[in-house]
Amino acid sequence: IMTSDSNFPEHYFNDEIHEECGVFGVFGVENASSLAYYGLHALQHRGQEGCGIVCVDENKNFKRVKGEGLVTEIFNEKNLETLKGDSAIAHVRYPTHGGGGIENVQPFLFRHHTGDFALGHNGNLVNSKELARYLEHKGSLFQSTSDSELLAHLIKKDNNGKHRIHNIVDALNMIEGAFAFLILSDKRLYCARDKYGL
């Protein structure tokens, strides 16, 4: 039983949703964006500020549709038709870090000479300020105010010809907090969860 004199922040006692973000991934399935769309419907209660889907097709082309609002406000038959491919990641946003705005709506899509990839994140990185300072010192330029973008910069900061999975593991070892990440490349879908089991 919770009472108003419990040691909980006041916002726990209002009627608003208190869950934060949701990620959904599909790999190797025909019409992946359709499944991702229905996955977002199932996760809609976890975030209502914005949502997005990134899909990759057989030609290694990444397509993205994202926007601010509910799933049914952002997606329609016409824009879902543009998301062709057999792999996709999707995200619903409830901001815990960074402000509002379309630049913070995920999944993020990153273009790089070693290969493009998309990233979706649920959670909160408690060492985000330190990581942002470190990455800025190394020359990173950020496109959002979301802590989620940090992982992409960490993955690409010291490529040194290593396989992407090694870069991902190295990057994950640098972050602290609660998280679930989906990273979609043209060949693989990587999933990572914090050691506490968010």
Predicted region positions:
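Conserved short alpha-helical segments that host acidic/polar catalytic motifs at enzyme active sites
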Residues: 2-198
